Amino acid sequence: MTEPTNTLPNLGAAELAAYIDHTLLRPDAGAAEIAAWCDEAVTHGFKSVCVNPIQIPLVAAKLAGTGVGVCSVIGFPFGASPTAVKVAEAAWVVAHGATEVDMVIDIGALKDGRAEAVRDDIAAVKAACGKALLKVIIEACLLDDEQKALACRLSAEAGADFVKTSTGFAGGGATAKDVALMRRTVGSALGVKASGGVRTRDDALRMIAAGASRIGASASIAIVAEADAASTGAKGGY
């Protein structure tokens, strides 16, 4: 799906699961499916369950005491809400149990060169997050490399905890090249989340090899099943 990486890390199913935000952002996802998603996350040890804001109270209740994080998107998927709306949305999801917030930047402002507006938008949401982690979605497929790097720098300056490649709703997803650029830009100061189009074990491992510290995926079960099969095959091979 993306540029090959020569050497992939050797991660077992449990190790790989710990990188993954088990993601369900379809607008037609109902309560039963969301609840099952939470059960899967607990069973496999995924890092968090990532859902739309309206589902956060259910997810927080289902995951209470499990150690699995509760992640909400805001300003999603276009990032085109006024800052005050993003702040209200962030405050609401945190009040209802979100431990992580994935926001979309003001993409138009970034492309217009209005860096201060982008930084202020992120900083305001960060303040509303309190102790919750903030991941900033830069929507890399809509940006050139200079804009990608700028978005990462502004996120760091605004106090974000992670930068994230994609919403998965803009026609492009994570690439190893973009992840590597983002990692070079933020260094070790921030996490880097690869999301959008990560569907296989090798996809996930390429992202991690390029510098990702978190993976967003809806194909999480298939990814860890492949990792488990690869590990079993290696142990049982001749």
UniProtKB/Swiss-Prot annotation:
Signal peptide range? none
This protein's source sits in the domain of life called: Bacteria
Reactions catalysed, as given in the entry: 2-deoxy-D-ribose 5-phosphate = D-glyceraldehyde 3-phosphate + acetaldehyde
Record keywords:
Cytoplasm, Lyase, Schiff base
Q: Which GO terms describe its biological process?
A: 2-deoxyribose 1-phosphate catabolic process; carbohydrate catabolic process; deoxyribonucleotide catabolic process
EC code(s) of this entry: 4.1.2.4
Indicate the residues that form the catalytic site. Answer: D102 (proton donor/acceptor), K164 (schiff-base intermediate with acetaldehyde), K193 (proton donor/acceptor)
GO terms under cellular component: cytoplasm
Q: Which GO terms describe its molecular function?
A: deoxyribose-phosphate aldolase activity
Its chief place of residence is cytoplasm
Cellular location of this protein? Answer: Cytoplasm
User: Which biological pathway?
Assistant: Carbohydrate degradation; 2-deoxy-D-ribose 1-phosphate degradation; D-glyceraldehyde 3-phosphate and acetaldehyde from 2-deoxy-alpha-D-ribose 1-phosphate: step 2/2
Q: What does this protein do?
A: Catalyzes a reversible aldol reaction between acetaldehyde and D-glyceraldehyde 3-phosphate to generate 2-deoxy-D-ribose 5-phosphate.
| Family recorded in the similarity comment | Belongs to the DeoC/FbaB aldolase family. DeoC type 1 subfamily.
Q: What is this protein called?
A: Deoxyribose-phosphate aldolase
**What organism does the record attribute this protein to?**
Rhodospirillum rubrum (strain ATCC 11170 / ATH 1.1.1 / DSM 467 / LMG 4362 / NCIMB 8255 / S1)
